[in-house]
Regions:
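Conserved short beta-strand elements that form part of the metal-binding/catalytic scaffold
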Residues: 34-68, 107, 114-120
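Conserved active-site tyrosine of GNAT-family acetyltransferases
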Residues: 24-28, 85, 112
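Vicinal oxygen chelate
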Residues: 11-19, 62-88, 103-108
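N-terminal beta-strand motif that seeds the catalytic metal site of vicinal oxygen chelate
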Residues: 1-22, 69-71, 118-122
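Amphipathic alpha-helical segments
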Residues: 20-35
């Protein structure tokens, strides 16, 4: 448990979940001069956006009642952090899952919103 609380966990990625990826990408391109880059991912597409040197970003199309930004916070051990969130009363929306560059899970609290937990491969 101490490993989970050894300092602040930084946000390393922001991802917009939306029902209209094309229009959302165009909105942010016009508003903030972001230049979304189309990345093929499995059977879908992902719009990667450059948010600066410290934070990655993207826009993903999915079924959602309303668009929402999902922050990814880096953790040391994905399984421990996910279980810690569960003990704090969060619902686990996505159990820890491995991807090409790390592991992620998504947790939700009725009072604190949703956050993705991220453990990069080293």
């Amino acid at each position: 448990m101490n490993a989970i609380r050894t300092g602040s966990r930084r946000v390393v990625h922001l991802e917009l979940h939306t029902g209209d990826q094309v229009r959302a990408g165009a909105f942010y391109a016009e508003l903030l001069q972001w230049r979304p880059e189309l990345v093929r991912a499995g059977s879908g597409c992902y719009l990667a956006v450059d948010l600066g040197p410290a934070v990655g970003g993207g826009i993903i199309e999915c079924q959602t009642r309303r668009p929402l930004w999902l922050p990814y916070a880096e953790v040391e051990r994905i399984d421990d952090a996910t279980e810690h969130a569960r003990r704090l009363g969060a619902a686990v929306l996505l159990e820890p899952r491995e991807g090409p560059s790390g592991w992620r899970s998504v947790v939700s609290s009725p009072v604190a919103g949703e956050v993705a937990l991220w453990q990069p491969k080293r």
